[in-house]
Amino acid sequence: MKPRFESSLANRAAQVVITLAGLALFLAIRPDIYASVSNRLMSDYQRKVVTPKLISDYMQRSREPKLQVGAGLNNADGWLNSDIEPSATQAYIDITERLPFHDMTLHAILGEQVIEHVTYEEGFRFFREAWRVLAPGGKLRVITPNLLSFVALFSDQKPPAYMARKLDFHYWPADTPDPACFIINGEMRSWGHQFVYTPKMLRASLEKAGFADVRQYAPGVTDDPDFKAVEVRAKTEWKDLNDFDSMAFEATR
């Protein structure tokens, strides 16, 4: 007769095999759940394992650390590129959360077409966090839609070809009876937009967050070569749209 503990061990092993086989069968039957679980595990791994290492390695080798939030496909050389849905080489950073940097450690922060995707309160907290992590003299540059430009669509204060090109750019219907109405609704509600600023509101928010030197620029225009090298929308064939309906602000700590 074999000892009981061997039998018990064999039983447990069999139970594990049966459980795993059942789980595999269930996931094969429900690929949607498999995809959801897989994506969650990958996201957690990216956030908790990959991102801390990416940030640590970058901060150690960079003499003037620069952070790009909401980078998307724009992986700028010399920058720590981040996104809420990061690629394999990007850090996971959610601008509604505390930024994972020590006080006064970054040289520059860039957010191109990002801040409008969060609420006003979340945006203000991000500005406060940016002020905290920037070194004295460090700069934050924000490029975002300008609400005044969309209000101007209801007057004659717009480029003649703007509305047709805007509708074409977003694949919106060209035969809409009121293009201005369609565009402003789209800009306020599409792509997860939460809050679209006027220049007055954005300047006031940055100043309230602690920035002393706040300046407005046209998109793509800057005195800082670091920002000029990484900003992308001002370099595309749709530059004319960006020039009219977006604004850029730089704020110095």
Where are these regions (language model features)?
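Conserved SAM-binding loop
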Residues: E64-A152, F249-R253
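Short, conserved clusters of charged catalytic residues that mark active-site
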Residues: V49-K53, I93, R125, Y197
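S-adenosyl-L-methionine-dependent methyltransferase catalytic module, highlighting the catalytic core
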Residues: E122-W131, A135, K139-T252
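SAM-dependent nucleic-acid methyltransferase catalytic core
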Residues: S36-N74, T222-V232, E237-F244
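Membrane-proximal basic amphipathic "stem/tether" segments
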Residues: M1-S62
